[in-house]
Amino acid sequence: MGYRSDVRIMTTKKGFKELNKYVKDYLSKLNHDEYNLLDNLEFKAENDYAVYFGWNWLKWYDGYDSVDAIESGLNHLRDKDMSFRFARIGESYDDYEEDSYESENEEEQDLEYPSMNREFDDSYVIEEMERVS
């Protein structure tokens, strides 16, 4: 089954197009049909300025070509002075990772940061208690 994570990324619309192009080029250079995460988003919201997207319950491992393509693409956005926000929540309570870049270009500024809540799932615990009674 493996360890799973939830991932959220925020870019400008221009940044999303650049990331998409970069990831496609990155994966095509591997000379095999690799799964493109950007073609398989589980979550996407956008407005006139920004795109907020991500995946739930994903194997986000270094060394997976699809993951490396996204991470390399975010570094590419940084190199091109394009803002982004990245957050990953792992299964373990203390497993949280984030990265971001704020462009000096006014058109690329003021992106929201991903927001997360961790909370108790009381209904699950109560159901399990009732099940074993």
Model-derived features: positions:
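Charged interaction segments
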Residues: 23-133
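Short, extreme N-terminal segment that most often corresponds to the first beta-strand
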Residues: 1-27
